[in-house]
């Protein structure tokens, strides 16, 4: 059970690090994937499963990093237009469509299939879900705190207005 408490401490520390803005450091997902790879490879001990897992994880990590870097650098933009199927057509409505970037993370999971997900991949996804859940809880707590402050502020404002009105009428 000593390993469980260290894992809990690591998760708490990682959550605290996620809430603090960082600059140009490797993403938490990359660190978690590397950590899980080291732990999983020691427990699995099979080179074939290691190669298969390395390729899957590097593909998914590269896809996530590509999508994240693209959205950070370029911001929201419309995708490029498709070329018309009939180049000789003039003045008419040309069949225009948009190429949408597919959700690469979902595609990787769909390609792998749920049957092929081993314990290591499930552990990686579980940890990512825990990080996301922790962020959500922190945001919910922050929202509750702001609602409490707003209620207190408006209560004080109304009280001061009533006291001011009472003093004005008394004069």
UniProtKB/Swiss-Prot annotation:
Residues 1-27, 68-92 are annotated as: Disordered. It is a single-pass membrane protein. GO terms for cellular component: endoplasmic reticulum; endoplasmic reticulum membrane; mitochondria-associated endoplasmic reticulum membrane contact site; mitochondrial outer membrane. Pfam families: Miff (PF05644). InterPro entries: FATE1, Mff-like_dom. The chain crosses the membrane at residues 151-169. Its main location: mitochondrion. GO terms for molecular function: identical protein binding; ubiquitin protein ligase binding. Coiled coil: none annotated. Keywords: Apoptosis, Endoplasmic reticulum, Membrane, Mitochondrion, Mitochondrion outer membrane, Transmembrane, Transmembrane helix. Involved in the regulation of endoplasmic reticulum (ER)-mitochondria coupling. Negatively regulates the ER-mitochondria distance and Ca(2+) transfer from ER to mitochondria possibly implicating it in the regulation of apoptosis. May collaborate with RNF183 to restrain BIK protein levels thus regulating apoptotic signaling. This is Fetal and adult testis-expressed transcript protein homolog. The gene is FATE1.
């Amino acid at each position: 059970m000593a390993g469980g408490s260290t894992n809990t401490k690591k998760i708490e520390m990682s959550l605290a690090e996620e809430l603090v803005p960082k600059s140009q450091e490797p993403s938490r997902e990359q660190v978690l994937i590397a950590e899980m790879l080291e732990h999983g490879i020691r427990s699995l001990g099979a080179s074939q499963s290691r190669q298969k897992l390395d390729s899957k994880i590097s593909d998914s990590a590269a896809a996530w990093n590509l999508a994240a870097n693209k959205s950070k650098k370029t911001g929201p933009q419309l995708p490029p237009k498709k070329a018309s199927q009939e180049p000789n057509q003039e003045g008419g409505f040309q069949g225009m469509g948009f190429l949408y970037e597919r959700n690469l993370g979902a595609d990787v999971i769909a390609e792998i299939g749920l049957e092929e997900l081993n314990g290591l991949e499930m552990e990686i996804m579980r940890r990512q879900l825990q990080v996301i859940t922790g962020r959500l809880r922190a945001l919910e707590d922050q929202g509750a705190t702001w609602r409490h402050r707003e209620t207190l502020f408006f209560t004080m404002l109304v009280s001061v207005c009533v006291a001011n009105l009472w003093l004005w009428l008394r004069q």
